Amino acid sequence: MSETDTIVKGWHGKLNLVYADRSNSTQLIYNHQQAPLKVQRPFYPEGEKVCHSVILHTAGGVVGGDRLSYNLHLQPNAQALITTAAAGKVYRSDGLQARQTIEIKIDAGACLEWLPQETILFNGAIYRQDLRVELATGANFLGWEITRFGRSARGEKFYQGEWRSHTEIWQQGVPLWIDRQWLPGNDAVFHSPHGLAGQPIVGSLVWLGSPISTEIIEKARNLGNTQGEAGVTSLENGFLCRYRGASTSEVRNWFTSVWQLLRGEFFSRGKCIPRVWQT
């Protein structure tokens, strides 16, 4: 069997969502889904202004040859929070790459909080994720990515396989942040200070669209009181948090605290943890 034949038999999931502001209520006005991707019915735990959505991967995990495609569009003044129902799992590959592509467009006055749960790469996984965000003037984006290399609770290390993560965020044709990461699975890279330094978890949180004061950046740094390595970098009209360590709960707690800080600063919104994170 050729590689092309194998890829065709893999999952080719698609999820296209469009959100619109209707009289100060954000509505999911378009939803096209193709298995194994699915979105739950929208809900509003903090009022009609912010639409909460939960994405499900009904196959339970990703294997080599799978292709997952997301296309998200927030029309002017729409406000949405999107997360996932569970941690993503990328299983050991037989040589084929699994790939996830996310295209996001955020119009003027709109804001997306893109908060997926962590991705777990099994040893031997071959995985690539591409995320591209297009911001209009006056739009805001907050997103994070948390990746665990190997099932470390079982003592597994990422000594085989490959991980690529490409992120681009643009505003009016100007690149605000471009980040390309590549990690081949082997002992040397796992333990190298230029790789994982023996730590199985990395994470990035980025906020872009509105200028950030030095006071907010300093508060975000102070919230990063972790055993793992944590850093905060100022960006043009935003900032970036990075983590490298051994605890999913530690990085999630830090990122959640930063997210809540930004919500209060820019939108005067209170704490609203998605219920699915607590199940």
From Swiss-Prot:
Required for maturation of urease via the functional incorporation of the urease nickel metallocenter. UreD, UreF and UreG form a complex that acts as a GTP-hydrolysis-dependent molecular chaperone, activating the urease apoprotein by helping to assemble the nickel containing metallocenter of UreC. The UreE protein probably delivers the nickel. The keyword Chaperone applies. Disulfide bonds: none annotated. Keywords: Chaperone, Cytoplasm, Nickel insertion. GO terms for molecular function: nickel cation binding. The keyword Cytoplasm applies. This is Urease accessory protein UreD. Belongs to the UreD family. Pfam families: UreD. It is found in: Cytoplasm. One of its GO terms (cellular component) is cytoplasm.
